[in-house]
Amino acid sequence: MEIKITEVKENKLIGRKEIYFEIYHPGEPTPSRKDVKGKLVAMLDLNPETTVIQYIRSYFGSYKSKGYAKYYYDKERMLYIEPEYILIRDGIIEKKEGE
């Protein structure tokens, strides 16, 4: 799996970086969010606790996927802005009992 950063935008108003990337995975299935997040965190020297993978989109018959991640400078701001299902999906918070 190879990740290429295509664009990095700094959103100063919200206090985050928005990262667009492409994943090349010839002969392999679409990589998991956990694997992609780990590689992005290592490549860009980010904090995994404040990095969220918004989406990874694969295209039929292609060995390439596109993705979008957000890196927040402050964890409290991330918890306020990001929807709960995204935080649960990325393993940042636990799902509440009874849901």
UniProtKB/Swiss-Prot annotation:
Record InterPro entries? Nucleotide-bd_a/b_plait_sf, Ribosomal_eS24, Ribosomal_eS24_CS, Ribosomal_uL23/eL15/eS24_sf
- Give the family from UniProt: Belongs to the eukaryotic ribosomal protein eS24 family.
Positions the record marks as coiled coil are none
The record ties this protein, via HAMAP family, to: Ribosomal_eS24 (MF_00545)
GO CC entries: ribonucleoprotein complex; ribosome
Q: What is the lineage of its organism?
A: Archaea, Methanobacteriati, Methanobacteriota, Thermococci, Thermococcales
Tell me one GO biological process term: translation
Q: Which GO terms describe its molecular function?
A: structural constituent of ribosome
The entry's protein name is Small ribosomal subunit protein eS24
Q: Keywords of this protein's UniProt record, alphabetized?
A: Ribonucleoprotein, Ribosomal protein
The superkingdom listed in its UniProt entry is: Archaea
